[in-house]
Amino acid sequence: MTLLIKSIDDLARQKFDVFVPTMGALHAGHQSLIELAKQKGDRVLVSIFVNPLQFENKDDLAKYPQTLDADLKLAEAAGATAVFAPTYKDIYPDEITKIDAGEIGKLYEGASRDGHFSGVLTVVKRLFDLTKPSVAIFGEKDFQQLFLIKQMVKQLNIPIEIVAAPTIREADGLAMSSRNVRLDKDGRKSALIISKALKENSIADMHKVLAEEPGFTLDYLEIIDEDTFLPASEGSKNKRAIIAGWVNGVRLLDNKRMGGAL
């Protein structure tokens, strides 16, 4: 049976090999992270903490689904050893020292969500300090977040291996996200334009596909160099298309590894 840990003192009595940080509202995408974690170590800890620091929009924070009972069942089914569900005071007991996300943290998601990545890095660093795992699992769907966490771990010499897990999709191609439950029937249909666009092989063709769907409002579409997170050039070895926008006021993200010419 999966153990529920609610206090830092109880957490300190335990030792875990692999850590999967989440904000709850777990779905099959999170399940895949936990299952991957089980391949990396015997004792897997999942955290559930909705981090206020990464929400610029307080209304967005208020609407974020919180489903602890269902989350515990999914975590147990996926093989988690324990779930850590701390309070705000556990994570931020004193004055908060925020981590600067740097110049890359101001681009793309960072440009649209002021302070978002500083909030992400701050909570991840705090959770790392508390949980002390050997390995941590993060999904590729939030690719800029993954890049910045890897950068932070390298810069601060944190002795944790960051493992990237592939994006899990619904049967129709939509990238799984806790926010998808906020889409109505028409919005759900409009959202499919994102994965449809990513099937194209050039950014120009992606824009053409996106223009077909009036229900989708584009924020950004870019092909970046995975090693720098700056716009890719012909010499870039590892390229990835990243996209974000809104459907029904719900922000959606996706990305795809690219090959060939720009």
Indicate where each model-derived feature is located.
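Phosphate/ribose-recognition catalytic cores of enzymes acting on nucleotide-derived substrates
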Residues: 209-262
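Nucleotidyltransferase catalytic core that binds NTPs
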Residues: 2-215, 224, 228, 256
